[in-house]
């Protein structure tokens, strides 16, 4: 029978089920060990690849695959999870899909894209780098992609690019 093998070569005794991590085809006398990155419960005729988002963490096809954690992903049949690289994040919280690139004005963290804080900007449009502080006399909103000079009639009175420019009270 499929998933069983005649391991004692005696047609008078019943075939034995193949153990977890192995398989057999109809009429087999031995069970075949599953490849790394796959698993098989007892008595199957095939090994199943760990699905995308799960891994063969212990390289043992007799144990079930386990899910990758937050901010990680893996393709089918993998033996390790991949952490989202800089500039990307696990935006859909699905370890079966690759991490997505963060947009300009933000930077990547493994689980989410974080907008640049007030007074900073993503100067090179590369979400893998940190946000850069604006200079005195300029400001940037949260998630800024550039610093803006204070408009005519306004000044950076507190010299803090994280606060809006103030109107000129001295006129």
What is each stretch, according to the model?
Residues 1-171:
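Disulfide-rich, cysteine-dense extracellular ectodomains and adjacent flexible linkers of secreted
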């Amino acid at each position: 029978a499929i998933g069983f093998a005649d391991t004692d070569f005696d047609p008078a005794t019943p075939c034995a089920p193949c153990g977890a991590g192995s398989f057999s085809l109809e009429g087999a006398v031995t069970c075949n060990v599953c490849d790394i990155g796959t698993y098989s419960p007892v008595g199957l005729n095939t090994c199943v690849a760990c699905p995308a988002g799960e891994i063969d963490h212990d390289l043992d096809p007799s144990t079930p695959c386990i899910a990758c954690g937050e901010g990680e992903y893996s393709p089918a049949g993998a033996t390790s999870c991949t952490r989202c690289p800089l500039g990307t994040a696990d935006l859909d919280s699905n370890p079966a899909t690759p991490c997505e690139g963060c947009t300009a004005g933000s930077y990547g963290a493994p689980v989410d894209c974080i907008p640049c804080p007030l007074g900073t900007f993503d100067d090179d449009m590369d979400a893998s780098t940190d946000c850069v502080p604006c200079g005195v006399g300029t400001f940037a909103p949260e998630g800024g992609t550039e610093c803006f000079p204070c408009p005519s009639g306004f000044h950076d009175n507190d010299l803090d690019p994280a606060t809006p420019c103030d109107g000129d009270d001295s006129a």
